């Protein structure tokens, strides 16, 4: 059971989440566009932070709710371009205080989380796994995450624009 105490209530939502469960920065494949890679490389000076890997959950390959996502992100061999993970499943950029990348450098899918989305737009409901029960009374998720809907919509547009800059991936499931 999740309980908000006076001590935990002063923490950001992501920190409260991390006290209760594995987070979105752990055990999650983070898809990156070439634009994401350029931003991260320019910030870190590194180019060894991504790879092509099959999804942890094989059901991911069966999704058909966003044909554009499938067409531009999943290769014929079932792999996707994702951030590297440490041996325990943590994102390579997850540090003791959270993400080590500044918000404007983080992958676009990370900036959009905890919202699900498809090419048509951003869902009003949070993604499965986001512990909304840890929201402070009277606070909304966007407010708690310090997210602006207009900014999130811009990231969403940018994500799909960057994906479409590449040749579509020929995939048997489309």
Annotate each predicted stretch with a short phrase.
Residues 1-174:
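Short loop/turn segments that flank or connect secondary-structure elements
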């Amino acid at each position: 059971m999740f309980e908000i105490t006076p001590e935990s209530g002063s923490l950001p939502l992501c920190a409260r989440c991390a006290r209760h469960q594995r987070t979105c920065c752990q055990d999650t494949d983070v898809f990156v566009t070439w634009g994401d890679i350029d931003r991260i490389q320019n910030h870190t000076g590194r180019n060894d932070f991504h790879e092509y890997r099959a999804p942890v959950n094989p059901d991911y390959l069966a999704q058909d709710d966003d044909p554009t996502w499938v067409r531009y992100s999943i290769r014929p061999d079932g792999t996707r371009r994702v951030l590297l993970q440490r041996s325990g499943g943590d994102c390579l950029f997850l540090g003791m205080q959270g993400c080590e990348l500044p918000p404007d450098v983080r992958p676009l899918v990370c900036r959009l989380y905890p919202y699900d989305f498809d090419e048509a737009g951003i869902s009003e409901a949070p993604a499965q796994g986001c512990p909304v029960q840890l929201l402070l009374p009277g606070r909304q998720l966007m407010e708690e995450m310090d997210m602006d809907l207009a900014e999130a919509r811009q990231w969403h547009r940018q994500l799909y624009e960057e994906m479409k800059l590449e040749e579509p991936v020929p995939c048997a499931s489309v």
